[in-house]
Structure formats: structure tokens, C-alpha cells
């Protein structure tokens, strides 16, 4: 059986259990449609419903839908192909997935409702329903949270087909990262580096899974920086790039940091890279991701001590809360159909969830690690003045050292990890190794 055949079998089984547990006979998953801007007739780029592309690798077909009846083991895909002379038709090439579904081409949503008849009224509807006629459809329930929670909990365990797609997404992004790195060392501006990244993989800006972070010098301290200066700085010091790609609807999310010259910042990047790789060896089924996060904070604390940013040993630096000022974000998150993939707070498929940590409120993943999980590991260290204000009177902090780092901004390194029963796969580093880049 092919990887996709196994995948759709798994998806059918997961939907069967979710529908059974929540008293639904069937479900209609709507792909979504563009939403025009306020007082305008233009729409931002369309993003498909993740639960639609969970079934089939179709990401550019708005107004389409998937109907699945519990126990049928075969979904019906209503693929919308508009009779439209204004736009290019949606290109859906013949692929294996079409052998595992009943495919029906429609050019009007009334064709879907007529085909389903009374089945529609017995279905759970999952998707956006802001526009007619979808908002007028009579369905049993719209976006029932219990059903969605059930599906989201199990989406954390990736099928082999999903891992294969994530691997390809990392290969694409690694290729683009290499081009961006070359542009950085060639003295290009942030915008030029951004263009080099997109050009290396022939992506439009709307095709990357999130706004790429392309940050030179002190901009690296802005966690979600996406301004892109058009002129390079007079003195180039550092480069942080956080950017991904998509393949068949699956996302990659890679961060790398580079020093323009050898010295203090280059040593800091090397230390963070070493600490990150040490943490990777701690990833095992049954380990709490929260405990991994704390372990990384202790490693960051050791770096703060080793580089004389803060006086004291690693444990005392962590206990006093200093690491949260230098690494305010979480260690990572699930990744898959979405960059910040779902289910990170769910305890079970009944919707019970973990409370966010008071000490680490921005951590997006609190579950114990399981075989089949795919998540990012992305430690960082930055000069964020807003966060350092709380410690402005601290005698423990070596402010001269902080000032030395300030023009470099910060450092972050991010890989995606597949958890296996007999060892883990680093999708990101493997992709760079294939290119001879790491």
C-alpha cells in the first residue's frame, strides 16, 4: 500500500471515531473562499482550510468541499471549477489521491447541495461560512468544537505520507536558505535577500507559509521582524533568517543565524548551535516537552554565564528569571499542515487541555512527546530592551556585555524533528546536509 493510501485510510479512521464519539453521521469540510478587504473588491491571498488539505493535497481550489459519511472509508471531493473568463482556471493534475476519492467537478455550489440533498442537514460543517450561500446551508452543526478538538488531538501523530511531505518542504526551504545566506555575505539588503530566497525556489510571496523574517544586525532582536530594509546597513554585522516553504500543503519553518565576521557574535552562534544539538539528544517518547523547554532555558543560562552577560551559575540565572528576558518565546511547536500546528495544549481527544504555564506563557506545546510527533526546536537569545527594563537595576547583569550584543540583535536556530521509536529524524539538518551546506 502506498504512503498516501495509508494516509487516507488513517484519516478516514480518525474521522470515523470523531464522528461516532460526537453523534454525527457525516461531515462536510469546506475549503474556504477569498474574503475581500473592507470597502474594497480585492482579497488577500487565499488560504485553504487545513482540514480540507488533510484529506487531499489541493490548496488552490476555493469553494470546494469534502463530504465524508461515517464508516464509508471513501470521501467525496466536490472540486469547484468556475466558468470564469476573468481568471486562470485552477490546475489540478491527475494524481494518486484521485484514485481514493469520488471526484465530482462543480461550477456552482448549488450542484453540491442538490447532490447531497437531506444528507447535508445531518452533517457537521467544518470551515468558514461568512458568505452566501454557505452561510445559509442547513446543517446539523457548524464547527462543533468537540469534533474539531478530537481531530486536532490526533493530527499531532503524523502519517508517513505527511512526514514525506514535511521532508520535501524542508528541502525546499534549505535550498532557499542557502541562497539567502549567499546574498547576505554578498552585502545585499534585507529586501534583496528576501527576493533571493523566493527566487531560489520560484515561490511567490503568498506561497511561503508565513511572513519570512529577514533581519540584519539589531533587527534580529525583533522576534517577528518583517519590514525588509531596501538599503543594506553601513556596517553589516549579523543576519537572522526565519523562513519556510510549503509542499503539498505541508510547512517547513527554519531559522539560521550568521555572523558577517569572526569574533564575539560568531562564537555566540556556535555556542547556541552546540546547545541546541545537545538538547536534541534529550528528545525521547514519554519526555514532557515542557521539561525540554526548561532544559533549554538552563542551557541558555549557561551561555549567559559563559559569555559573562550575567554573574552566577546556570541554575541561579534561571531561578532569578533572567533567561525569560533573553529568550522570551517558547522552545517550539508542532508543525505540519500549519506552521504552528494544532493540538499542543490538548490532553486528550475529549477537549481537555493543559493550562498555559505562568512561568513560560508563550510555550505552544505542553504535551508529552510521542512517536509520530513532529515539532520544532528553536532556542534563541536576544537583546530586547522592553524585557530587560524589569532588570535594569540588577547588579548581576553585565550591561557592557549586553551593549556589545545589542548591535547584533540576537541569535536563533530552528530545526524540525520527527520523533521515532528507534531514534529521531532531523528534517532540517538532513536537508542542509544533502546540499552540502552544513
UniProtKB/Swiss-Prot annotation:
GO terms for biological process: proteolysis. Mn(2+) 1 binds at residues 253, 333, 378, 414. Its EC number is 3.4.13.9. Pfam families: PepQ_N (PF21216), Peptidase_M24 (PF00557). It is an enzyme of class 3 (hydrolase). It catalyses: Xaa-L-Pro dipeptide + H2O = an L-alpha-amino acid + L-proline. Splits dipeptides with a prolyl residue in the C-terminal position. PANTHER family: XAA-PRO AMINOPEPTIDASE 3, XAA-PRO DIPEPTIDASE. This is Xaa-Pro dipeptidase 2. The lineage of its organism: Bacteria, Pseudomonadati, Pseudomonadota, Gammaproteobacteria, Alteromonadales.
Amino acid at each position: 500500500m502506498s504512503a498516501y493510501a495509508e494516509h487516507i485510510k488513517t484519516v478516514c479512521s480518525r474521522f470515523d471515531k470523531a464522528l461516532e464519539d460526537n453523534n454525527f453521521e457525516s461531515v462536510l469540510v469546506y475549503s474556504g473562499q477569498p474574503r475581500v478587504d473592507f470597502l474594497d473588491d480585492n482579497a488577500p491571498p487565499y488560504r485553504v482550510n487545513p482540514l480540507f488539505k488533510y484529506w487531499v493535497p489541493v490548496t488552490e481550489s476555493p469553494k470546494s468541499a469534502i463530504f465524508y459519511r461515517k464508516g464509508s472509508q471513501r470521501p467525496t471531493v466536490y472540486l469547484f471549477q468556475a466558468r470564469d473568463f476573468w481568471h486562470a482556471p485552477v490546475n489540478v493534475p491527475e494524481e494518486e489521491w484521485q484514485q481514493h476519492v469520488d471526484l465530482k467537478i462543480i461550477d456552482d455550489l448549488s450542484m453540491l447541495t442538490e447532490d447531497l440533498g437531506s444528507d447535508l442537514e445531518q452533517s457537521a460543517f467544518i470551515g468558514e461560512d461568512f458568505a452566501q450561500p454557505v452561510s445559509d446551508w442547513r446543517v446539523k452543526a457548524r464547527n462543533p468544537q468537540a469534533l474539531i478538538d478530537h481531530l486536532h488531538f490526533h493530527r499531532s501523530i503524523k502519517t508517513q505520507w505527511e512526514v514525506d511531505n514535511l521532508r520535501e518542504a524542508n528541502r525546499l526551504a534549505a535550498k532557499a536558505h542557502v541562497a539567502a545566506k549567499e546574498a547576505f555575505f554578498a552585502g545585499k539588503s534585507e529586501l534583496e535577500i528576501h527576493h533571493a530566497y523566493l527566487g531560489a525556489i520560484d515561490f511567490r510571496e503568498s506561497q511561503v507559509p508565513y511572513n519570512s523574517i529577514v533581519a540584519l544586525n539589531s533587527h534580529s532582536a525583533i522576534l517577528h521582524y518583517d519590514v525588509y530594509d531596501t538599503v543594506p546597513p553601513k556596517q553589516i554585522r549579523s543576519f537572522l533568517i526565519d523562513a519556510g516553504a510549503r509542499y503539498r500543503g505541508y510547512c517547513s519553518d527554519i531559522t539560521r543565524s550568521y555572523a558577517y565576521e569572526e569574533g564575539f557574535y560568531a562564537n555566540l552562534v556556535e555556542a547556541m548551535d552546540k546547545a541546541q544539538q545537545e538538547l536534541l539528544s534529550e528528545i525521547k517518547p514519554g519526555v514532557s516537552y515542557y521539561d525540554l523547554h526548561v532544559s533549554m532555558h538552563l542551557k541558555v543560562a549557561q551561555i549567559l554565564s559563559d559569555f559573562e552577560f550575567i554573574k552566577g551559575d546556570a541554575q541561579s540565572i534561571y531561578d532569578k528569571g533572567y533567561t525569560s528576558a533573553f529568550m522570551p518565546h517558547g522552545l517550539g511547536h508542532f508543525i505540519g499542515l500549519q506552521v504552528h500546528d494544532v493540538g499542543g495544549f490538548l490532553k486528550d481527544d475529549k477537549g481537555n487541555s493543559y493550562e498555559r504555564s505562568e512561568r513560560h506563557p508563550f510555550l505552544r506545546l505542553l504535551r508529552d512527546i510521542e512517536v509520530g510527533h513532529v515539532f520544532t526546536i528553536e532556542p534563541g537569545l536576544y537583546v530586547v530592551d522592553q524585557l530587560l527594563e524589569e532588570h535594569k537595576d540588577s547588579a548581576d547583569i553585565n550591561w557592557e556585555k549586553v551593549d556589545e550584543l545589542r548591535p547584533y540583535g540576537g541569535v536563533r536556530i530552528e530545526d524540525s524533528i520527527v520523533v521515532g521509536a528507534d531514534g529521531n529524524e532531523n528534517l532540517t539538518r538532513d536537508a542542509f546536509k544533502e546540499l552540502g551546506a552544513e
